[in-house]
Design a protein with these regions (language model features):
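N-terminal hydrophobic/helix-forming segments and targeting peptides
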Residues: 1-465
């Protein structure tokens, strides 16, 4: 190739590179340190409640205080508010008025899981089980025959709330059984999404009876006695409980080279942690920087702790009131990075991806101009100017990024909180970490992509305009 053609190619054509061809040794060390901290966050926060607690603890260590309505705030002040124990909003007050807008990163900290039903405990054939109702878009067959924990709370009539933790390392864990292949012929002929019906996702919780042999439900009684002895609860208390079955495995490095992280809950705690950590690591920004860690995204962002809730508006309104700024003025000048994961190209399932418009492992933070399904249904389609703004911001900050869609046009689709932020008249763009095996009990991400997403969040918070 002539030098002229080489120069023309470099001038006119994209030349995406594997991020490892760009990072130096110091950056690689920073990446590893960041990912070590992220794995600790994952292990501490297997539910939205636990994630919120871990985030609050980290924030308070860095000088954040709980916001009280009417609190006088000045540039550099760091505040947070917790939404019913399951969502979190944090802010670092900027030098400029909120009339100039805010720089927002909105992620979610709920993940697909199995929730206990209100009346979960039963006995059948002298084995005790918990009935579950799956939460979010799971592939049901992936949840059988893996070790599970039970985490959550039981709210009692007297107003007390009991934390429940069953199945940590070294303790007895729970499991959902599956059919042996010797008798699985009929099951094997069913479509994959029908082979394991939702009503069969029952947690095996005991088999040892107590009492006399003629008594009924002796195994169920034994399980309930164990729970009462440890937590002081009765069967009736399940009616006011939020108990979640989540994978027991901890976050681990993946690959002979240790270049990836495998864990439950990357979607979307990988972006939630990046946004949180970026906010904790900045000094006084020009514009007020806001991190949102929302609940209920996996089921449509509904409810008081979801992104459609007025809780976010109330928090921002309180901040604006302190500066005599109308909330609508802040929103119309604000920018939001809807921080959610995207699908990483998997060559084992190449038929559902459009390779030219897919996110690749180790190519950095994945921008998504739109999500949705088929004809962009349910999408927040960012305008060209918004994408250009982030391109320039990331390039100036040295962030490695790529742009992608979720998959082939008619192969499926997905959504994020972007539409709910955009509906508030906030300029919004989706961006996040590419994930392999998304929504599985054990997902995989690249360490490099995690680190670059953190850098991208930090660049948004530190933006001058």
């Amino acid at each position: 190739m002539s030098e002229e053609m080489k120069a023309l190619r470099e001038q006119l054509l994209r030349n995406d590179k594997n991020g490892y061809d760009t990072l130096d040794e110091a950056q690689l060390r920073e990446m590893e340190a960041y990912c070590t901290d992220y794995k600790a966050f994952l292990n501490a926060g297997k539910t939205e409640r636990l994630s919120a607690r871990a985030a609050i603890a980290a924030a308070e260590e860095r000088g954040f205080v709980q916001y009280k309505r009417g609190m006088a705030l000045k540039a550099g002040d760091k505040v947070y508010t917790c939404n019913r124990g399951k969502g979190l909003m944090l802010a670092v007050i900027g030098k400029e008025s909120l009339a100039e807008g805010a720089q927002i990163a909105a992620a979610h900290i709920d993940s697909p899981r199995l929730d206990l039903k209100p009346t979960p405990l039963y006995e059948d054939s002298e084995m005790a089980y918990f009935k579950t109702h799956y939460y979010g878009g799971i592939r049901k067959y992936q949840w059988v025959t893996i070790p599970l924990q039970l985490r959550g709370v039981v709210a009692k009539k007297d107003g007390s709330v009991v934390d429940v933790c069953i199945g940590e390392a070294g303790e007895p864990q729970l499991v959902i059984t599956d059919l042996l292949p010797h008798l699985g012929g009929e099951q094997g002929r069913k479509p994959l999404n029908e082979a394991v019906p939702g009503e069969t996702l029952n947690l095996l919780v005991g088999s040892r009876p107590i009492g006399d042999s003629e008594d009924k439900d002796r195994v169920k009684l034994h399980v309930m006695k164990r729970l009462h002895d440890k937590y002081g609860i009765t069967e009736s208390d399940f009616a006011s409980a939020e108990l979640e079955a989540v994978p027991a495995a901890e976050a681990v490095d993946i690959g002979i080279d240790g270049s990836m992280i495998g864990s439950y809950g990357h979607d979307d705690r990988v972006c939630g942690y990046a946004a949180l950590r970026a906010l904790l690591d900045i000094e006084t920004p020009d514009k007020t920087a806001v991190c949102v860690l929302a609940d209920k995204e996996e089921i449509g962002s509904m409810g008081v702790t979801g992104m459609q809730s007025a809780a976010f508006d109330a928090f921002m309104s309180d901040l604006c009131d302190g500066q005599n700024v109308p909330l609508k003025a802040c929103f119309e000048n604000a920018f939001c990075l809807s921080a959610d994961v995207t699908a990483a190209y998997d060559p084992n399932f190449a038929e559902v991806y459009e390779k030219r418009n897919s996110a690749f492992v180790n190519y950095g933070m994945g921008l998504c101009k739109y999500t949705g399904a088929r004809g962009k249904s349910g999408a927040s389609d960012a305008d060209a100017e918004t994408v250009a703004y982030i391109r320039n911001l990331f390039d100036e900050a040295g962030v490695i990024w790529q742009i992608a869609e979720l998959g082939k046009v008619d192969a499926g689709g997905g959504g994020t909180v972007a539409m709910y932020m955009a509906n508030r008249n906030i300029t919004t763009l989706d961006a996040g970490v590419p994930v392999l095996s998304m929504h599985a009990p054990f997902e995989t991400v690249s360490k490099l992509d995690c680190y670059e997403t953190y850098k991208g969040m930090k660049a948004v918070f530190q933006a001058e305009k």
